[in-house]
Amino acid sequence: LFSSSSQEERDNLYGKSKKEGRELMIDWAEKAGGKFTGMIIPNVFGPFGHPNYNSVVATFCHKLAHNETPTIEVDGELKLIYVGELVEAILSEIRKGKSNAELVIAHTSESKVSQLLSLLECYKAAYQDKGIIPSINNTFELNLFNTFRCYMDIASHFPVKFVEHTDPRGSFVEII
């Protein structure tokens, strides 16, 4: 199995090197009689990605969770796949036991960079800042929310202090 990138189609050094690497592995497999599958993978996101490396989701989550302000360089359209969905696609391909020189892994969601940042800002404002679970409308949003949560500084965030309300009848706190 060889992991390549949807960047293969772009005219940049990274994309060219990924495509060339995949093609070299295809040649090797043919000459050596080996099996080879070259996966072309969209933008992967999920818990514990490396910020400031190759995932805008990881970078935005890390910055927001640490009270930094992310910036958008290019507000492009992203084709995304959650890491768990990618693992399922890889396992499915392994179970087939066949070579596939160019296996395009389908993206499972799309988002403009600005829309992605807006959702993450809502998660921070609701969950991290106020302790409110945000509205989750689909699987993508659930995966994105869970990704955001892994970047929070858990030691300083929890336990959450509840606001006590008191009147002549007694005291109570609101919890989820």
Where are these regions (language model features)?
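Conserved Rossmann-fold NAD(P)-dependent oxidoreductase catalytic core, especially the SDR/UDP-sugar
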Residues: 1-25, 29-32, 36-39
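Mid/C-terminal beta-alpha module of Rossmann-like enzyme folds, strongest
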Residues: 89-164
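Conserved beta-loop-beta element that borders a ligand/cofactor-binding pocket
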Residues: 26-49, 62, 68-79
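Substrate-positioning beta->alpha
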Residues: 49-59, 73-95, 112-118
